[in-house]
Amino acid sequence: MTSRSLLPFVLSLLLPRIIMAQSYLELYSHQWLNNWKSLHLLNELDGQFPLHCLKESMNFKLPAEMLHPHQFQQENATEAIHDLLQQIFNIFSRNHSQTGWDEAIVEKFLHGVHQEMVWLELFLEEEMGWENSTLRRDISLHIKSYFKRMMDYLKGRNYSSCAWEVIRMETKRSCLVIYRLTRKLKK
């Protein structure tokens, strides 16, 4: 009789974890595919990095936390992915007229990034209530500082085509970080 009365209690403890694990697996699949599409579109913009722009490359100092995604919990990884996408969207919404890039590809890229941000926001609100932890604020500030350095670089170079190529390559690096963070969602 005692085991029968414990079953509903045990199920009530386990069920939310099972549902959350399933949600993260779905998020992982969705995020992995969209990140792949973003990288593909960034490659489509201009192909290989122009050699004459090599002298303009710069180290934007990717936040140290991003280099060690194994330290993230799933919810922090999800929030970091969202922050990275938000900053990528902000920077690519700027003046890129000097690049010669196909505007349709840029728009498709921005649309995909925006859709992913909305999807992540819904996930964060539904699954976790999206509480702003201290860790999250610290990570968010580091990500914003990283992208501010990128934006300052672009402005300082008057949004030149070489400056945009450097930013495009750095954004591809950010997409690789997103991929590494996305793998954290699978666990």
Curated annotation (Swiss-Prot):
**Stored InterPro entries:** 4_helix_cytokine-like_core (IPR009079), Interferon_alpha/beta/delta (IPR000471)
Q: Disulfide pairs?
A: 53-162
The PTM Phosphotyrosine maps to: 24
**A Pfam family matched in the record:** Interferon
The primary site where this protein sits is secreted
Q: Which residues are glycosylated?
A: 76, 95, 132, 158
Its biological purpose? Type I interferon cytokine that plays a key role in the innate immune response to infection, developing tumors and other inflammatory stimuli. Signals via binding to high-affinity (IFNAR2) and low-affinity (IFNAR1) heterodimeric receptor, activating the canonical Jak-STAT signaling pathway resulting in transcriptional activation or repression of interferon-regulated genes that encode the effectors of the interferon response, such as antiviral proteins, regulators of cell proliferation and differentiation, and immunoregulatory proteins.
Spell out the subunit comment.
Answer: Monomer.
Q: What is this protein called?
A: Interferon beta
Annotated organism of origin: Tachyglossus aculeatus aculeatus
